[in-house]
Amino acid sequence: MTIAFYPGSFDPMTNGHLDVLIQALNVASKVIVAVGIHPGKAPLFSFDERAALISRALSETLPGEAARVEVVSFDNLVVDAARQHGAHLLLRGLRDGTDLDYEMQMAGMNRQMAPDIQTVFLPAGTSSRPITATLVRQIAAMGGNVDAFVPKAVLEALNAKLKR
């Protein structure tokens, strides 16, 4: 069984994240979506909320694939968390050259620390390239329409959280 580890903050999950997750299911038997918990950061959604939104978005988009996805939290090094879950693939989505430069540096460091874990880059689809969770939060907080950038479940949760 090929287990892939897909880390991120997913605050909130965007269509870009979902695009990468769908691609990941084509290269791995199981995908661990790992929500990073960072002390000092104040996320919009709690871990439990993010986990539920990821699961709902996946079930709305690919019903029947939920059994192949597990959502976990982690607060340690990505490679250590991947090992704890038996993953040998580390998945990273790429939107542009800036992402590539950063992710290549991270992949090199991860390779030094964990030569048994291979980083796999998955390119974002054309429609999801400009999307970031930070921009989604900012646009939504200012009353903008983000329905083209997030799954339906996330849109509903954003509207409820921001009382719109």
From Swiss-Prot:
EC category: transferase
**InterPro entries, per this entry?**
Cyt_trans-like, PPAT, Rossmann-like_a/b/a_fold
Provide a Gene Ontology MF annotation, just one: pantetheine-phosphate adenylyltransferase activity
Residues binding ATP: S9, F10, H17, G93, L94, R95, E103, S128, R129, P130, I131, T132, A133, T134
Which residues are recorded as binding substrate? S9, K41, V78, R92
Q: What Gene Ontology biological process does one annotation of this record name?
A: coenzyme A biosynthetic process
Question: Its Enzyme Commission number?
Answer: 2.7.7.3
Query: Subcellular localization, per the record?
Result: Cytoplasm
Catalysis performed (reactions): (R)-4'-phosphopantetheine + ATP + H(+) = 3'-dephospho-CoA + diphosphate
Lineage top rank: taxon: Bacteria
Q: Name one GO cellular component term.
A: cytoplasm
Instruction: Tell me the route in metabolism or biology where this protein functions.
Output: Cofactor biosynthesis; coenzyme A biosynthesis; CoA from (R)-pantothenate: step 4/5
**Which cofactors does this gene product need?**
Mg(2+)
Coiled-coil positions are none
Which UniProt key words apply to this protein? ATP-binding, Coenzyme A biosynthesis, Cytoplasm, Magnesium, Nucleotide-binding, Nucleotidyltransferase, Transferase
- Record site feature (Transition state stabilizer), residues: H17
Summarizing the function annotation, the protein's role is: Reversibly transfers an adenylyl group from ATP to 4'-phosphopantetheine, yielding dephospho-CoA (dPCoA) and pyrophosphate.
Q: Which family does it belong to?
A: Belongs to the bacterial CoaD family.
Q: How does it assemble?
A: Homohexamer.
Supply the name of the protein: Phosphopantetheine adenylyltransferase
